[in-house]
Amino acid sequence: MRHYEIVFIVHPDQSEQVPAMIERYKSTITSHGGQIHRIEDWGRRQLAYMIEKLAKAHYVCMNIECDQTTLDELEHAFKFNDAVLRHLIVKMKKAETGPSPMMKEVQREEAKKSAATQPSEAQA
């Protein structure tokens, strides 16, 4: 089995359905004997360019190990899901398990937000 990194972008109006979508894709992978090494929900982010007149979308990254039939099934699911705006599947040499640079950025932004709200709460 080969290692893959999958990033898919979901319509921002469908953000509440992302956990269910991730579970569906996880069950597809594991039911065919594949493994999931990392799943990262990057949240709503600014798009580099407008897609379907949208400036923001919900990003999800998955690092998996699966066979070609499972990958074909996942790609088919992405293509025929109207909520998925774009998807990218990249073959990797080895399994990635640590946090991605994008996830580190998300965590840094969350830390800044929580640090900014704590002083205002202390004054109140």
Swiss-Prot record:
One of its GO terms (biological process) is translation. Gene3D superfamilies: 3.30.70.60. Residues 96-124 are annotated as: Disordered. One of its GO terms (cellular component) is cytosolic small ribosomal subunit. Keywords: Ribonucleoprotein, Ribosomal protein, RNA-binding, rRNA-binding. InterPro entries: Ribosomal_bS6 (IPR000529), Ribosomal_bS6_sf (IPR035980), Ribosomal_S6_plastid/chlpt (IPR020814), Transl_elong_EF1B/ribsomal_bS6 (IPR014717). Transmembrane segments: none annotated. Pfam families: Ribosomal_S6. Coiled coil: none annotated. Residues 115-124 have a biased composition (Polar residues). GO terms for molecular function: small ribosomal subunit rRNA binding; structural constituent of ribosome. Binds together with bS18 to 16S ribosomal RNA. Belongs to the bacterial ribosomal protein bS6 family. PANTHER family: MITOCHONDRIAL 28S RIBOSOMAL PROTEIN S6, SMALL RIBOSOMAL SUBUNIT PROTEIN BS6M. This is Small ribosomal subunit protein bS6. It comes from Paraburkholderia xenovorans (strain LB400). The gene is rpsF.
